[in-house]
């Protein structure tokens, strides 16, 4: 009897212990834990709990070849954004010799207007209809109009096609970071910064295309060659070949995006939409395909409660009220509001400082006696390619720095300050070799800041409003690009004042980076 009673007590204690462990496991499943960036903001307890489960599942699955495919295919978007923006600036001078436009900076403004509208359109619709559609469609739109730009019969038509091509490309910086981040395990989040290396690859491609076509298939500028033949379509095909080739390359990239990965909607977008079953199905699909564990179930998601989608979308998902609701969501708490404002300010400042520097520097150096001579087109585009190649490695270093205790904030601050130092030093350039060297170093240092800002922005934005917040941020950047083009047309470019203003802006950007409210290092994005 005593043995039987003792055995019964042991079974009872064992059952009680199992019950306690089960309760603790359930509590851990639905609690926020210490890892989420926005965990202390308490904007939506149900959504926060579900997001914690999704992050746990993504971390449990780990990094797979699926993520490498995402890294490359999303990187295409980065490359295309920089490719289209640079191609228009590269071909503008040769196209102007053929068309004799009344407003030489018109192509720059057309490109930035297209990029602005694209960033806002693709970013905001990504929060409404999802990331998948824009991921599959945007590059197709870009490629079609890029090819059309090469066949333009007039300056105005060229500007229109550049604007439409830029519209397709303009949403990629918004979408690519969001798509990659929302599938990415937390231990690999610094790869989001590394992905900005694709921006440099796009610049490098632009340099190679210019180097290959323009020296061999372009008319000569009468300003430097008085005996040059009149510039016509027949003897000035180089800039058209650049557009045809770049458009075709983007089209191939768009087909690869659609066929290689057949992207499923991101799990974090699905959670925000209240589509828990689809979220679980997506993560289980990835786990099964790559033979990984995934303990997330629909029951665990439903145990957290029901997501209030009306609070995230407004009264109507398809009206302006939805856009307003997503904008309000970025200011749900005081710290989130400060973070959003500082991010937008940073994008505004860098959007003005970098193009303004490039606009004023050549005239400033010329007025101070810098003697570069008139290099051949071959040497011009060789140097351009070298500078763009240097820009690839800034995000590589930044990706490593972000994975250390420096974190994102101090990586940005250091990148901005070092860039400022070399900007000041660049004003003392006097020879062609110095010009090439400093251009390469500045491209490298600038992309440390730029690449980290690209990654930091989506990391600290809530997933339900990520596209809207990121789109508006990049939109401010594009507005400043338009402003810089206008300034270049009407301002006196012989003064040193703009150079020092640009340097001061980089100091301000470094200060803003340090006081950002959130540091993603060691934490998980929502």
Description of each model-found segment:
Residues 150-161, 215-219, 427-438:
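Helix-loop junctions at membrane interfaces in 12-TM secondary transporters
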Residues 37-69, 228-237, 246, 284-359, ...:
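Flexible cytoplasmic loops linking transmembrane helices in multi-pass membrane transporters
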Residues 67-101, 206, 210, 354-365:
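Extracytoplasmic
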Residues 99-100, 130, 151-157, 168, ...:
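Helix-breaking motifs and short loop linkers at transmembrane-helix boundaries and internal kinks
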Residues 1-93:
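Cytosolic juxtamembrane N-terminal segment immediately preceding the first transmembrane helix
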